[in-house]
């Protein structure tokens, strides 16, 4: 049995909608994946994500779960699904992006990356092989290859050197992943064989995605794409964007890269982005997204609405008895006013962050639902124009 099944259902220009099936859920694409860094989407209960918001897939963070509680504990407790009680699909990143953001705390070699934990300063090591082993322990449906993410403004030579390392690491990731899926866990890092966890056979249960790098250099993006596809993966991701480059550069890279990616595999844009970014990336052929913005902004009073972003801390909302977004049908918008949410935030109540994060996730997931419907109807181009024009109303008014 294949670990995932992917079929394109409809197209409108480069935009496409499809069905991604895993062992745990059927996922309609384009899809936004809430980020569950520590095995939880910050401030939001899984019941809400599953029952109200109908999120079919979320992200787990290999770096953070590697450090705490550790793969051995998660393996012993039956994998991240059982440990966290998340019942639907999981995609885990490789840990590469987080490690390479620790510029002053890491040492890069051909073998992998030695770094100091941001928790206690202890020395740790991640390599393609270790990353695959940790993600096997997490038992996610989709595993990401281990890569190096250069800065967005990296020069050509530095980016090319990084790309070549990423290509070698991609092959090592593929080889170790295949060993684990075929033979089970035989590494000294993790002592519990996959076939004994919860009485389930884990062989062949995960899919592996490769990552295309190259910063803003289109020639290198093409080379990375060709080398990654040459290795062969179940899906392909565009990495190394939204890391400081100009937005126009990001859009140029997506527009150049996405249409050249295999048509018969999901296309994933990592770590991006705003609602506008999602719409523009779908327009250029992307299927999958993740970003921390809905919950990160929610914790600081930032709400995404159909007319642009607002900050509930603004004094103008002190007596506003309207919902966060009149066009949103989420439980937060049906029940609570802007004035009440502002009061909660000003009072330092934890509930404020939870409610605004919940709304933001509902907004992102609903946006993707509207995108899918417009593609099916052959109306995505008009939807894109109308959506973006409406989205800029508050931004233009300075709210």
Predicted regions: what they are:
Residues 125, 129, 156, 160-167, ...:
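Non-membrane alpha-helical structural segments and their capping/turn regions in soluble enzymes
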Residues 1-21, 27-34, 42-43, 147-153, ...:
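C-terminal extensions of enzymes
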């Amino acid at each position: 049995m294949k670990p995932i099944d992917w079929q394109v259902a409809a197209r409108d220009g480069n935009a496409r909608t499809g069905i991604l099936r895993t062992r745990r859920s059927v996922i309609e694409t384009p899809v936004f994946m809430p980020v569950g860094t520590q095995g939880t989407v910050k401030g939001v209960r899984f019941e809400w994500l599953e029952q109200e918001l109908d999120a079919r897939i979320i992200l787990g963070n290999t770096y953070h779960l590697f450090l705490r509680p550790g793969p051995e504990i998660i393996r012993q407790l039956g994998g991240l699904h059982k440990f966290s009680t998340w019942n639907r699909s999981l995609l885990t990143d490789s840990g590469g992006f987080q490690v390479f953001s620790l510029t002053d705390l890491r040492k890069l070699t051909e073998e992998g990356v030695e770094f100091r934990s941001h928790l206690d300063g202890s020395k740790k090591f991640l390599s393609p092989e270790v990353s695959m082993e940790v993600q096997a322990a997490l038992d996610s449906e989709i595993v990401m290859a281990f890569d190096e993410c250069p800065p967005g403004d990296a020069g050509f030579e530095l980016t090319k050197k990084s790309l070549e390392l990423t290509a070698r690491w991609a092959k090592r990731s593929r080889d170790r992943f295949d060993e684990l899926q075929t033979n089970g866990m035989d590494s000294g890092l993790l002592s519990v064989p996959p076939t004994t966890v919860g009485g389930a056979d884990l062989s062949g249960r995960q899919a592996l995605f490769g990552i295309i790098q190259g910063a803003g250099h289109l020639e290198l993006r093409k080379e990375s794409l060709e080398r990654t596809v040459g290795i062969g993966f179940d899906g392909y991701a565009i990495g190394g964007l939204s890391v400081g480059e100009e937005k126009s550069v990001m859009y140029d890279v997506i527009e150049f890269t996405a249409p050249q990616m295999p048509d018969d595999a999901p296309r994933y844009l990592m770590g991006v982005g705003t609602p506008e970014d999602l719409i523009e990336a779908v327009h250029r052929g992307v299927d999958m997204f993740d970003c921390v913005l809905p919950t990160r902004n929610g914790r600081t009073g930032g709400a995404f609405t159909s007319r642009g972003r607002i900050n509930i801390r603004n004094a103008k909302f002190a007596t506003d008895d309207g919902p966060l977004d009149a066009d949103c049908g989420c439980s937060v918008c049906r029940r609570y006013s802007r004035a009440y949410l502002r009061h909660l935030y000003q009072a330092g109540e934890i509930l404020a962050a939870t409610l605004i994060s919940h709304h933001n996730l509902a907004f992102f997931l609903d946006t993707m639902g509207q995108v899918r419907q417009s593609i099916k109807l052959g109306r995505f181009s008009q939807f894109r124009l109308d959506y973006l024009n409406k989205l800029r109303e508050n931004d233009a008014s300075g709210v």
